[in-house]
Each structure stands twice: as structure tokens, then as C-alpha cells.
């Protein structure tokens, strides 16, 4: 499962296909670890050893070491406090992923996200939950991030794919692999060749975070080999992160329950719980508009 929203799809798979052989993944942390590697002068993010816990698009690094066991957190924290994830190569020639203006703002805003808990290093997506007022104020409803992606990355990728199909070859097609491709290839190699590498996966908690819902689909480091994955226990997590995660995982579980039961009430509750939405009345308005916009795709909600 390499989809978006991976968290909701992962929860749906857990509920509806509990015996399926599914690995749920997201590459956003990989891109951020590339940035952290550059902060520390390390060429390959795969040299980093780390502890991480959270939900998909909703997590924190609590420990980061190099391959010699040196603690990199002080150096990374110093950079985050000054610059967020901005590292000076956002507009570097040849760089194609996460170069849109919204991503530049997101990487810079990570400084403020980090300030909320300077003991951990946050995932960038937390800006939507911790600073929703900022996101609304700096967004253009007539040209959203979705429009930006469709006019940029999507147009380039789809155009390159059509060109490859027309030519019958990918040679000299100008289409280069990036973080998305490298991550899935590394994971496939680990499964096929039993490399026992460490990956961040979205898996049933079952004690990986002992003071959190055991049925939650959490994002934690796992060792991956030919027999699948083994979770690395992260230990109890702080109250702040635990509270945020409990609220967000309830959103995700209620969305899946709403789909299974065809329940308007539960989807309204899910949106009401989301920290991106200020009130139940706004949640209801959004839900009604979503139903109208997606009437050809959604089940009937009662």
C-alpha cells in the first residue's frame, strides 16, 4: 500500500482484509532523512540509525545516530531551530520532487512545528494540525496545492509516461528515479534478498508503542527480510504526542467505520475530531460539500 491517504487505507486493510499480505509505506520520512543527512554532512541517509513513532504523516524522530553511534540530534536540532528543513538545495538544478512553492513554505514552517516540542524532530505534515490557521491564511482557494501539483509534478510525470509509451522505450526519456522509486526498490530488494534493512512501515501497533491503542496502525521502524517485517519497539511515548495521536487515529478509524457502515454520523464525527477543522458546524458543512462533490464515487451515507 503506497497510496494516499496511506493511514486510512492501512486501517481499512486491517479491518476488511486482516489476513492479506500487505505492507503499508510512505516515503515522506525518507525525503526528510535525506535532508537530515545533509545537515550532518552524511552522503547516504541509509547510514542513519533512528527511533521514530507516530501515524502516517503524523510522527516524530526521538533518536538519530550515525553508523558509528554518534548522536546527531544536537546538530539536527540546531538546524531545525534556525531553518526548519530548508537546506539550501530546494531550487537546485535537476531537483524535481518537493520543489513547488508550497513545499518551500512547508520546509520553512517546520521550524515552528519543531518549536512546539524541541525534544523531537517532527514530520512536516504536522503543520496542518498544529498551525491550521496559518495554512488557511497562506492558502489561495483559487489555486490550491492540488492545482500546483497537477500543473507541475503530475503534468511532467504523465507527459513523460506518454512519451515513453509512444517511443516504446524509457531510454533518453528524461524521466529519472527519485525518492519514491528508490524507496520501493530498496524495500523490494529487502523482501527478495533478505537484506534485513531498517524501514519505516505502517503496521498494527500490538505493543510497539506500549502506551497507545494496540489496534492502531502506527508508523515505526521495522527490520525487513524475506519473511516480512519485525517491528522495533519504541517504548512509551510522551503525553503530548500520545494525545495528538489518539485524536488523529480516532479520525482514521471513524472514517473507515463510516465507509463500512454507510454512516453519515460517524463521518461527521471523524471530521469534527480532526484538528484541521475548527468546529462541528464547519465539519458538517465540509462533509455535505464533500458528499455532493463525490456523489458518483461514495456510498450512500445515512
Regions picked out by a protein language model, each given a short descriptive name:
Residues 18-34:
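Acidic, His- and aromatic-enriched active-site or binding-groove loops in soluble protein domains
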Residues 6-10, 32, 207-210:
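Flexible loop/turn segments at secondary-structure boundaries
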Residues 1-17:
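Rossmann-fold NAD(P)-binding glycine/threonine-rich loop
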Amino acid at each position: 500500500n503506497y497510496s494516499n491517504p496511506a493511514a486510512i487505507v492501512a486501517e481499512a486493510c486491517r479491518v476488511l482484509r486482516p489476513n492479506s499480505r500487505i505492507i503499508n509505506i510512505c516515503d515522506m520520512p525518507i525525503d526528510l532523512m535525506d535532508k537530515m543527512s545533509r545537515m550532518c554532512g552524511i552522503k547516504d541517509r541509509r547510514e542513519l540509525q533512528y527511533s521514530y513513532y507516530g501515524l502516517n504523516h503524523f510522527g516524530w524522530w526521538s533518536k538519530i545516530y550515525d553508523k558509528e553511534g554518534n548522536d546527531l540530534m544536537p546538530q539536527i536540532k540546531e538546524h531545525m531551530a534556525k531553518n526548519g528543513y530548508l537546506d539550501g538545495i530546494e531550487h537546485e538544478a535537476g531537483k524535481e520532487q518537493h520543489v513547488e512553492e508550497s513545499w518551500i513554505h512547508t520546509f520553512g514552517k517546520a521550524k515552528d512545528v519543531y518549536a512546539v516540542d524541541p525534544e523531537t524532530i517532527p514530520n512536516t505534515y504536522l503543520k496542518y494540525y498544529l498551525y491550521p490557521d496559518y495554512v488557511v491564511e497562506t492558502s489561495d482557494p483559487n489555486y490550491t496545492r492540488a492545482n500546483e501539483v497537477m500543473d507541475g509534478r503530475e503534468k511532467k510525470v504523465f507527459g513523460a509516461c506518454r512519451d515513453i509509451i509512444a517511443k516504446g522505450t524509457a531510454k533518453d526519456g528524461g524521466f529519472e528515479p527519485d525518492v519514491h522509486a528508490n524507496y520501493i526498490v530498496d524495500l523490494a530488494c529487502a523482501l527478495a534478498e533478505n537484506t534485513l534493512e531498517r524501514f519505516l512501515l505502517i503496521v498494527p501497533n500490538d505493543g510497539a508503542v506500549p502506551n497507545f491503542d494496540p489496534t492502531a496502525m502506527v508508523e515505526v521502524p521495522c527490520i525487513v527480510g524475506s519473511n516480512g517485517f519485525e517491528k522495533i519497539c519504541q517504548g512509551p511515548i510522551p503525553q503530548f504526542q500520545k494525545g495528538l495521536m489518539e485524536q488523529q487515529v480516532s479520525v482514521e478509524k471513524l472514517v473507515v467505520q463510516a465507509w463500512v457502515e454507510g454512516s453519515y454520523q460517524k463521518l461527521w464525527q471523524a471530521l469534527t475530531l480532526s484538528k484541521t477543522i475548527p468546529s462541528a458546524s464547519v465539519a458538517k458543512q465540509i462533509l455535505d460539500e464533500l458528499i455532493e462533490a463525490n456523489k458518483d464515487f461514495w456510498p450512500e451515507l445515512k
